[in-house]
Amino acid sequence: MRILLSNDDGVHAPGIQTLAKALREFADVQVVAPDRNRSGASNSLTLESSLRTFTFDNGDIAVQMGTPTDCVYLGVNALMRPRPDIVVSGINAGPNLGDDVIYSGTVAAAMEGRHLGFPALAVSLNGYQHYDTAAAVTCALLRGLSREPLRTGRILNVNVPDLPLAQVKGIRVTRCGSRHPADKVIPQEDPRGNTLYWIGPPGDKYDAGPDTDFAAVDEGYVSVTPLHVDLTAHSAHDVVSDWLDSVGVGTQW
């Protein structure tokens, strides 16, 4: 199995390094990751400047000023030859649950892999300690995919409780929960009297029902949420069409 491994925490982050070490026991792994923390970069792509790379002695590649999406795009189209069999993103430091997936560079890297035609996993740890647990879960999933490919056309967003592996209760297939919108902005004054702003923490859980990713992780289970690239709200198609007819948009301007 050939694995392109990326993240949004940066090439030296403990999550990606722990996972790379575990995966290299049974797979051919190429790390292509940002040279710095790009958390919250979502699906952003660098279009107005060129991208430089640096290759470390162990073969890991850092993309200077690159986003997670840049890294997967370059990895698939230029840097990993032969091309990968699968794209893996993580292990993220902290969860990507509910609405987090909108902003997550970890999820975006996997989405880019899926968009380019490859199976993809995004893996996050609900904390900052037991990366070995998340690595073991990821290895088990990848071995399963090697034995029997999952042909859903979706990515798997995997969130792992921050527990020793022996304390993880199992695995659940979940849906994304949701949070209250975060509205906190933290202003500060710099030494010259100018105001600068920090984005505040995420909102509290709003929808954390028993079938959500929030509930699974809180209860000690690995959460696996299938996600897809198509953002079309198919269930709203007829409602929007009827509304356009009702208000006359398209028949008169």
UniProtKB/Swiss-Prot annotation:
Q: Which InterPro entries match?
A: SurE (IPR030048), SurE-like_Pase/nucleotidase (IPR002828), SurE-like_sf (IPR036523)
- Reactions catalysed according to its record: a ribonucleoside 5'-phosphate + H2O = a ribonucleoside + phosphate; a ribonucleoside 3'-phosphate + H2O = a ribonucleoside + phosphate; [phosphate](n) + H2O = [phosphate](n-1) + phosphate + H(+)
Enzyme Commission number(s) from the entry: 3.1.3.5, 3.1.3.6, 3.6.1.11
Q: Which UniProt keywords apply?
A: Cytoplasm, Hydrolase, Metal-binding, Nucleotide-binding
The record, for Gene3D superfamilies, names: Survival protein SurE-like phosphatase/nucleotidase (3.40.1210.10)
Enzyme class, spelled out: hydrolase
GO molecular function, a single term: nucleotide binding
Kindly report the protein's main subcellular placement as a broad class: cytoplasm
Which cell locations does it reside in? Cytoplasm
- Cofactors named for this entry: a divalent metal cation
Q: Name one GO cellular component term.
A: cytoplasm
Recorded family membership: Belongs to the SurE nucleotidase family.
Task: Output the PANTHER family linked to this UniProt entry.
Answer: 5'-NUCLEOTIDASE SURE, 5'_3'-NUCLEOTIDASE SURE
Return the NCBIfam families for the record. Answer: PRK00346.1-1 (NF001488), PRK00346.1-3 (NF001489), PRK00346.1-4 (NF001490), surE (TIGR00087)
Q: What is this protein called?
A: 5'/3'-nucleotidase SurE
